């Protein structure tokens, strides 16, 4: 049995011929078949994967970067192999012949299409309690949620069923499950990764993102997807990182607060300067942009997708087949009652989104900051079966709102962000730290993430 490690470590082992690609695949298949209770996958084809591994072993990688590394792709991403179901009944037979561009780029670089990842239905939720494929369960405690909507991909990476994966992120959907499952989640600057071949939620915000075991792996996949040359090691000496205490550090679970402060203390010894500075009006502006834009764009974007692909099911039929009551109610409310009017949507895009963008730009420039750092999620994973509210720190709280609170604001203006696991609570649940930077600062964010990862040594404190 091959010991499953990071993509980067596995590539080194394959190049040294410590084991074959087929050996690697057999280990992943064996682990996956022993972990079906986690519901990580929406679809698999182990025979196809074995054949692909044999092809790599016969022909070699030709020097191509990913050399037969199997990846998991969220079920709303066209692979050309698995149905692009988006986790919903109405698309179970939808199988575009042409893979998404991001799949093509990774496959051209030698990656294998390992599995289709379970997801929250139509990406419209954060628990990944999918009524068709079952709830994706957290490998750290199987009674708990994985987070979503890219939960199956995060589970597959955290449980060593796949070496890495591609999810999608509208407001939190890559970084949230990564944080709850104790792996790395990266949302790039909006527009850096292609979105062709992906079932949409909100085209003005949707982007593919990375879920991997290490920041080194995120750097590797990012370089391949963006077709960019490796960058030289970036000096972090003298970097200024903002700590926006108001909002982002408010009302944290005690163990999350303690773990976050412990990580910050460790990082303070790494020649980086921390600046306590708040982002003004961030909660109010986010509220006026986030859900109004997503809820208004979603039905229109999905109708356009169905029309483009000539899918037999009508939009109404697809909606009637939604299995998740909360997703169904939200979509039906928009369709039947006009939950978000066009005027509210236009005001969000033309007024409040530019204000949010200007607020962030002024925050960085006026404080001389290179990036900001804060807890990825205010709380740890909770039991499967969550309702619309939960009790958080003794107060009944909106479930969706509290889980995405810290991750959502910058997503509305397309900034790059990275969630890195930094600690385990005493009951061994992961806590993540988010690093965000200005528009286009992906390399800087990843470099800081590597420093965080090296300093905190996740999982070794208990």
Curated annotation (Swiss-Prot):
Q: Which domain of life is it from?
A: Bacteria
Report the EC number(s), separated by commas if there are several.
Answer: 3.5.1.-
The active-site annotation reads 74 (charge relay system), 149 (charge relay system), 173 (acyl-ester intermediate)
What PROSITE patterns would the database entry show? AMIDASES
Name under which the protein is recorded: Indoleacetamide hydrolase
Q: Which PANTHER family match?
A: GLUTAMYL-TRNA(GLN) AMIDOTRANSFERASE SUBUNIT A, TRANSAMIDASE
Any one GO MF annotation of this record: hydrolase activity
Identify the metabolic or biological route this protein is part of: Plant hormone metabolism; auxin biosynthesis
Q: Is Hydrolase there in the keyword field?
A: yes
* Coiled-coil region: none
Q: Which family does the UniProt entry place this protein in?
A: Belongs to the amidase family.
Pfam families referenced in this protein's UniProt entry, alphabetically: Amidase (PF01425)
| GO annotation terms (biological process) | auxin biosynthetic process
From what organism does this protein derive?
Answer: Allorhizobium ampelinum (strain ATCC BAA-846 / DSM 112012 / S4)
Q: Which UniProt keywords apply?
A: Auxin biosynthesis, Crown gall tumor, Hydrolase, Plasmid
Q: What does this protein do?
A: Hydrolyzes indole-3-acetamide (IAM) into indole-3-acetic acid (IAA).
Q: Cite the source lineage.
A: Bacteria, Pseudomonadati, Pseudomonadota, Alphaproteobacteria, Hyphomicrobiales
Which SUPFAM superfamilies does the protein's record reference?
Answer: Amidase signature (AS) enzymes
């Amino acid at each position: 049995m091959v010991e499953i490690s990071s993509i980067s470590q596995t590539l080194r082992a394959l190049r040294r011929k410590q084991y074959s690609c087929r050996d690697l695949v057999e280990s992943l298949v064996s682990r996956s078949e022993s972990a079906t209770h986690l519901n990580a996958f929406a679809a698999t084809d182990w025979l196809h994967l074995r054949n692909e591994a044999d092809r790599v072993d016969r022909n070699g990688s030709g020097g191509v970067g990913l050399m037969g590394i199997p990846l998991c792709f969220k079920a709303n991403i066209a692979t050309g192999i698995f149905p692009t179901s988006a986790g919903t009944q109405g698309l179970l037979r939808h199988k575009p012949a042409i893979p998404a561009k991001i799949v093509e780029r990774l496959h051209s670089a030698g990656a294998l299409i390992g599995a289709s990842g379970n997801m929250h239905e139509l990406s419209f939720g954060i628990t990944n309690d999918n009524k068709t494929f079952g709830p994706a369960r957290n490998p750290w405690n199987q009674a708990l949620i994985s987070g979503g909507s890219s939960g199956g991909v995060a589970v597959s990476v955290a449980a060593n069923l796949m070496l890495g994966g591609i999810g999608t992120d509208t407001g939190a959907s890559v970084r949230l499950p990564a944080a709850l499952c104790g792996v790395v989640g990266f949302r790039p600057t909006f527009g850096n990764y292609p979105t062709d071949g992906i079932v949409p939620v909100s085209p003005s915000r949707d982007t593919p993102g990375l879920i991997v075991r290490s920041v080194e792996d995120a750097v590797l996949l990012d370089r391949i997807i963006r077709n960019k040359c490796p960058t030289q090691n970036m000096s972090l000496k003298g970097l200024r990182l903002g700590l926006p205490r108001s909002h982002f550090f408010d009302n944290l679970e005690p163990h999350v607060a303690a773990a976050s402060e412990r990580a910050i203390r460790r990082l303070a010894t790494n020649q980086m300067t921390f600046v306590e500075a708040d982002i003004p009006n961030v909660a109010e502006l986010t509220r006026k942009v986030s859900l109004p834009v997503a809820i208004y764009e979603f039905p229109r974007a999905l109708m356009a997708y169905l029309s483009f692909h000539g899918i037999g099911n009508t939009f109404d039929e697809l909606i009637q087949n939604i299995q998740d009551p909360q997703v169904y109610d939200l979509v039906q409310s928009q369709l039947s009652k006009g939950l978000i009017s066009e005027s509210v949507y236009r005001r969000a895009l033309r007024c409040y989104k530019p204000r949010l963008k200007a607020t962030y730009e002024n925050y960085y420039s006026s404080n001389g900051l290179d990036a900001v750092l804060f807890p990825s999620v205010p709380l740890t994973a909770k039991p499967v079966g969550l309702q619309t509210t939960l009790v958080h720190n003794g107060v009944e709280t909106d479930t969706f709102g509290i889980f995405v609170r810290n991750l959502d604001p910058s997503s509305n203006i397309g900034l790059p962000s990275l969630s890195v696991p930094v600690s385990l609570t005493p009951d061994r649940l992961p806590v993540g730290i988010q690093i965000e930077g200005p528009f286009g600062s992906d390399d800087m964010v990843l470099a800081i993430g590597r420093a965080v990862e090296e300093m905190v040594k996740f999982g070794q404190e208990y």
